[in-house]
């Protein structure tokens, strides 16, 4: 019931789902509703261990494996190295000989990889988020790769008629042009608590936030000149300029 259906096709799961609607849901500030690779791989691995799988399980596994094959990323690798002052730095770099990887999260609109910081705003590049989240979270993984051989055996045994052709050696979605890895994000104004226009007070917007907000209070500042003195006297305030 929670497996995401897109254009009539079963795909994968979100990291968390709403307990009432069963739709993809948010958890921590940087865990947004998404197609999630690693968690979905764990689900598929479990489903393939069930004896005598029924038609629903077969469809779920076939659908997820097709998604894993379609949206794998190739020619890339996640590099962790000592950056400035010895602080670990994580980057996504070219890796022609590397095996396929998957982003932790793919957005629900374009099915394209993204990363996120504690401000809850998705971004396309690791270097666009802070050091703490960039290095303290697994943004890319190879967990689904472990399923491909297992799936071939499972499908041949239980449902060869509907077996999906999958391969770790074919080009990924990024190299085939199915996705745009670094699509410039369109600012979603509905994602912000307050939008400030030129001539309006940024301070007034800040003071609309709770004194101790439990979630980031996001303020979008539209393009313009703001000759204002601002005092941020409460935590979890996120100021974002219109790009």
What spans do the regions from the language model cover?
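Active-site cradle of extracellular carbohydrate-active enzymes
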Residues: 1-34
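Extracellular "leader-to-stem" segments immediately downstream of a signal peptide or signal-anchor
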Residues: 161-218, 231, 238, 243
